[in-house]
């Protein structure tokens, strides 16, 4: 997933990038390794304990990031004001795309959980959008195979905001209305969903 995220965000020299739900930090590290000339990568997570794993992983690899404990739904103004060229939102989800590795999900997950996740995911997009510069791009990622957490969330968000949906094509998976769905594979590959949004410059 980290490889695909870096390909889709395509970080450029001098850019400020926000990893909004960053723990444990694998995707942030991959972005920093892909583009060592970023102006800044800000790694943000609501959990201080989980955020420490981001610090540990970046330090272990000799990488530099700005680490901030914050809820992506209500970012502090000092994060929002300079704006970001790109934002990664790898949001909390039902994890239905990784049931092969976590079979308990099939038993424990309830319908009400899916609705609550979808509400949280939409709130995260709402919270992040003001921090994205005009012309910037936001990559929405889940490890869910449920439309309620994927296309439905993006469509609901696009009804409320001026959004350009950018095309995604990968070597495997299925094109959806506003994103790309990778299904779990027999070889152990996880189920993932990606949607790439751009904020119009006008």
Language-model region placement:
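S-adenosylmethionine
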Residues: 1-202
